[in-house]
């Protein structure tokens, strides 16, 4: 019976690994300290219509190219969108809820596996 439990547990672990892989872009975007700081500063600025790179640069200790780099990663992860007004770009939060749902499901699955993992001897 122990073999069957181990096989079931391994299947769960492999499924979790696949779920984790699907969440990597979002995890990488959120996992960087500079991007976390950038997100917090944008939230503190609280401008629903969007924020320009220059305004973010003023609030952080990051250069303009660094802010642009981090914004690109956050956009690719589905956390930010851009609104264009002529030549001006305004960045705002508009998260990809499907990506967030996948992340929440992956975390719930990981918790479930940890709560029901086989006992070690």
Model-found features: residue ranges?
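Short amphipathic alpha-helical/adjacent loop interface patches that line ligand
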Residues: 60, 71, 107, 111
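Amphipathic alpha-helical dimerization/coiled-coil segments
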Residues: 1-23, 40-44, 92-121
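Conserved H-loop
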Residues: 66
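Base-recognition residues in the alpha-helical recognition helix of bacterial helix-turn-helix
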Residues: 40, 69-70
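N-terminal helix-turn-helix DNA-binding core of bacterial DNA-binding proteins
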Residues: 21-63, 87-99
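Alpha-helical residues within the helix-turn-helix
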Residues: 57-58, 69, 75-76
């Amino acid at each position: 019976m122990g073999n069957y439990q181990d096989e079931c547990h391994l299947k769960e672990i492999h499924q979790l690994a696949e779920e984790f892989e699907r969440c990597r872009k979002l995890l990488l975007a959120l996992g960087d300290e500079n991007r976390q700081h950038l997100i917090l500063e944008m939230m503190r600025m609280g401008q629903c219509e969007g924020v320009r790179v220059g305004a973010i640069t003023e609030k952080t200790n990051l250069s303009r190219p660094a802010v642009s780099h981090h914004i690109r990663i956050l956009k690719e992860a589905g956390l930010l969108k851009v609104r264009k007004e002529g030549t001006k770009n305004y960045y705002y939060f508009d998260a990809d809820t499907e990506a967030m749902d996948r992340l929440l499901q992956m975390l719930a699955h990981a918790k479930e596996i940890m709560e029901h993992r086989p006992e070690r001897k």
